[in-house]
């Protein structure tokens, strides 16, 4: 039973990420576009958030709330830039939506890989970049509700983004 609970909680946490991207794609399709570049836009936003969190904490910042706020703003800005690139290419230049979207997916993955390796090198080349203060703000749970046994673990053991 414990492995089922762990599987279910992981599915909810990782499914939320896919849900955010799918919601954006649904809104795009309501506007008449097929944006296959959603994963690339998500990569760009994620690496922007990681970089802002990394440099905030490296500069001596210790407030989890400020680190979380900066990383969220950077994610939004990075994703907006990715969306603007797609919009400029498909609307202004009338490029093929399928080709542009797939190119943006490849581009976003490459950008995230390049800057992720650069940040990893700056952090000592350990392969994992830690944002201890910022990640504690994202993982904050409601203490009373998350301790309600199986029910609390299934429904209240996630951060505020889920």
Where is each model-derived feature located?
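Hydrophobic alpha-helical segments embedded in the membrane of multi-pass proteins
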Residues: 15-24, 40-47, 80-84
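Membrane-interface helix caps of multi-pass small-molecule transporters
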Residues: 27, 51, 55, 84, ...
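Membrane-interfacial amphipathic/re-entrant helices at transmembrane-helix boundaries
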Residues: 1-21, 34, 48, 57-73
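Alpha-helical transmembrane segments within multi-pass membrane transporters and channels
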Residues: 61-111
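Short, non-helical or kinked segments that cap or interrupt transmembrane helices
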Residues: 26-48, 69, 91-104
